[in-house]
Amino acid sequence: MGQQLSGQAVTRLPEKLIKHVGLVRDSGYLTYDEFLGRVAELNDVTAKLASGQKKHLLFEVQPGSDSSALWKVAVRIVCTKINKEDGMVEASRIMNLYQFIQLYKDITSQAAEVFSSNVAAEGSSEDTCQASMWMGRVKQLTDEEECCICMDGKADLILPCAHSFCQKCIDKWSGQSRNCPVCRIQVTAANESWVMSDAPTGEDVAGYILNLADEAGHPHRP
């Protein structure tokens, strides 16, 4: 006989899984105008956090990536670290919508605490480079692309709905169903799924380790 999860068991669900479910729900309900508003908000918030510092972050929607009806799948957000003194780009990384939403929640949550405590000046001191710190967070988010089923294996494949899976889980699932196991969207043909792009090469990594922000996420070159 099957058993139902008790309320106590539900409360013991891994925090990581609960956070993932919330992010998936958030991305599902997000409208295009709200998305653009969040991009603008991050530019404003990070500018305030980095006030008085030599570097700042700039968030932009990659041109053309949001032009289709399936913009949530295709859209890419470019995060660039810029030196205010000479305008030089020091690092540039690219995120998908899911990764951007995670970063948005992280930054706005910390900013709310800083601003409400009236310690914005301390938070933007010369001792802590906000731009480099948040570029490091972008690296963490884009490096930890995980399987939506087991939340452990590295994602090898992504579906049109933007949910990603490791090869082991997707092999088990595809033999039983043609729907995404997370959102249940139907996948009608094999060519509707895509193999994840390879991780940065050794040469790429060597170029980025010179600076914390230079190791942030997937390399992006305009």
UniProtKB/Swiss-Prot annotation:
Zn finger limits (RING-type): 147-184
Highest taxon of source: Eukaryota
Segments forming a coiled coil: none
Statement: the UniProt record of this protein carries the keyword Metal-binding: yes
Listed GO MF terms: ubiquitin-protein transferase activity; zinc ion binding
UniProt keyword annotations, A-Z: Metal-binding, Zinc, Zinc-finger
GO biological process terms held by the UniProt record: protein autoubiquitination
Matches recorded under Gene3D superfamilies: Zinc/RING finger domain, C3HC4 (zinc finger) (3.30.40.10)
Pfam families assigned to the protein according to its UniProt record, in alphabetical order: zf-C3HC4_3
InterPro entries linked: RING-HC_RNF141, RNF141-like, Znf_RING, Znf_RING/FYVE/PHD, Znf_RING_CS
SUPFAM superfamilies associated with the record: RING/U-box
Keyword Zinc-finger: yes
PANTHER family to which the protein is assigned, alphabetical: RING FINGER PROTEIN 141 (PTHR12109:SF3), RING FINGER PROTEIN 141-RELATED (PTHR12109)
Protein name: RING finger protein 141
